[in-house]
């Protein structure tokens, strides 16, 4: 079918008649000029891809009519221009692609039809761990270990980059996916197949939203959805409401972009923006650099929105020049965006579009702050940190409480480290990490940290040797300007040597703490602290031994490392004493904004970006040396413990089976609120007494070789055993934190996997009960694949985080939702009952279904298949089955 909007296409420049764009102004529809800029991107993609099958004329009308349709839960398709993947989520995607080729061949189709149809960039950044720190060779040693542990995965990925068209792999040691995307991969405007169109993307990482700071619409999706986009399917999404976030004023000179984003995160969590876009506007936006905007956009998942969009303006174009982008491309980017009404002047209120709701922040009201101890939205002003931590100590166990009895608040434990005696207490800092693309992409906070380090060293201050300090920049550019500006030696002197280019501590790859420190924490039952410049601090994520974790700007990470404790009031208490015996306060070493900007102007230059990124695909010698086969079908090695052909397609036939009711299911787990994808499918270390450890031990591996769950996502046997294996999982059956459950028929307490296996052997279906925000956190496809492999047919929850719900759908697991005002407690459910879920043949999106218990009780729940497309996926047993059937025909 030809595109019914073909008449809108015209050359952007008469000199180049072969290069066209869809001129949305030719719609002559007054509604277009009132649309939020983010919605204009959705509209352009729909018009350009309209084929009356995947994208229909009615979809375009629905988007144009956004003012009304935003309130009606209407689904629209979106075909992003490209996909980005990181290696933890990318390995299972390439495994699925390889297995799909096998399945298509088995069903008589052409396996080479399975290929990405849009550009897919995979950045290897999740594998490196902080094994070595505080030594000059930390970087080399950590990279060597990364290769030793991950050689097999890396060989597989290198095979994928050669076997599949349109797939580029950025080797390990290059940087963090979102920073590499911002500084290098981002196009802003595509020039492809004779058309100009806005750059847009989805990524298999929830912080993909960082790119929204540059005016490129993008967000995180599950690996399963990303694979569908790579195969040419549009994403099906509810047309979102758009919250206009007006920024006014100018930030105080001592305030960092981190303080601004933590303030916005708390504010938007209170406003309630889950499932909505946030679009920034107002004169305050013009005060923010692209790095500042990217920091704010990066933490979008923490405030719960789908996207956090800053339309392109002059500052964006300046950033493209600063980062050494191609001058030829810069010529058409601005011209195209102006031609389609997508170029913004934040000082011109006449350009402000309509929004669902407007909220605002005066930047001058922002104060220096941190967030914690267990959630990114729990902002605490730095001036209140001591008081707040001390109130958390005694408060009831929860997001702001550790339930330490008052008589134990001043407990401490001495220990020997490096032949010297030290003391740990509640609030002692044991991890201080400058980490994560959230902040290392921002030269002002990184140079701020460097200048603070210089002043601290000059004042004779230091960091206790037992504190695990690290610096893991998101790209080589950071190290370049830290060295050129002369601050790197001072960072090293305080223990902040570069330990690797990757996510590291931010995703829990913080590596081991010194044994004496762990013993002191455990024996003293102390609430030890991690301070990091990351974006998430959920319990158990950063390190198992840091029960409190605070997000802070890079300069504050160093300040708390020097203090050695979170229990300090920087205004009244000194950081230490200098050689002359004088007290040194934080205000004495804090650099001014003018100092930072002067250094930034001098040392952050386009040549740096060009030099680093020119050689990005060839700079890693170990990667270059990897030998891989050139076959188009992958040869699965049965001895491999990293890469295994998944069982998802084993019994797949071309014919569809009608949907079946779930009869007499047992409850595997009875969970509460805010169960994250980290709880469901942890990414961190594999505990020695876990089912996954037993499996790997039986395959001849020693604990040293276990690596992490995240690195083993290409092996379903490990990942199924790692499902619900988080030591912080709180199962209401047990009333304690443990990766265990009660096997109801026998009453035995078992590891979750062992219980599920027993149910499966008896042919008994399973469900999970949960509370609000089920599946919050990372866009982890194994949090849906794992439960599927455990035999879980449905989850019954009060509400779902967006990405996780769509991942469950993509695996054919039913996301059921209680009716408003109902939950397990209100309905008197204990989880000991058996559940029958009646599934009718004539399914419709968001249909209410009957749930019957063996106690005789019945109630209704909503099946959260939100669109016809999602229903189609479910009826096929998941999105990949649907694609295989389509390709095999």
UniProtKB/Swiss-Prot annotation:
Keywords: 4Fe-4S, Cytoplasm, Iron, Iron-sulfur, Lyase, Metal-binding, Phosphoprotein, RNA-binding, Tricarboxylic acid cycle
Variant or mutagenesis effect after changing residue 437 to S: Loss of aconitase activity. Leads to constitutive RNA binding, irrespective of iron levels
A Pfam family this chain is assigned to: Aconitase_C
Protein's GO biological process: citrate metabolic process; intestinal absorption; intracellular iron ion homeostasis; NADPH regeneration; post-embryonic development; response to iron(II) ion; tricarboxylic acid cycle
Effect the entry attributes to changing residue 506 to S: Loss of aconitase activity. Leads to constitutive RNA binding, irrespective of iron levels
Binding site for substrate: 86, 205-207, 536, 541, 699, 779-780
Record function comment: Bifunctional iron sensor that switches between 2 activities depending on iron availability. Iron deprivation, promotes its mRNA binding activity through which it regulates the expression of genes involved in iron uptake, sequestration and utilization. Binds to iron-responsive elements (IRES) in the untranslated region of target mRNAs preventing for instance the translation of ferritin and aminolevulinic acid synthase and stabilizing the transferrin receptor mRNA.
Binding residue positions for [4Fe-4S] cluster: 437, 503, 506
Coiled-coil annotated residue ranges, if any: none
Subunit field text: Interacts (when associated with the 4Fe-4S) with FBXL5. Interacts with frataxin(81-210).
Name of the protein in question: Cytoplasmic aconitate hydratase
Required co-factors: [4Fe-4S] cluster
Positions of modified residues (Phosphothreonine): 628
GO MF terms held by the record: 3 iron, 4 sulfur cluster binding; 4 iron, 4 sulfur cluster binding; aconitate hydratase activity; iron-responsive element binding; iron-sulfur cluster binding; metal ion binding; mRNA regulatory element binding translation repressor activity; RNA binding
PANTHER family to which the protein is assigned, alphabetical: ACONITASE/IRON-RESPONSIVE ELEMENT FAMILY MEMBER
Cofactor remark from the record: Binds 1 [4Fe-4S] cluster per subunit.
Name of the top EC class for this enzyme: lyase
Superkingdom field: Eukaryota
Catalyzed reaction equations: citrate = D-threo-isocitrate
Annotated source species: Homo sapiens (Human)
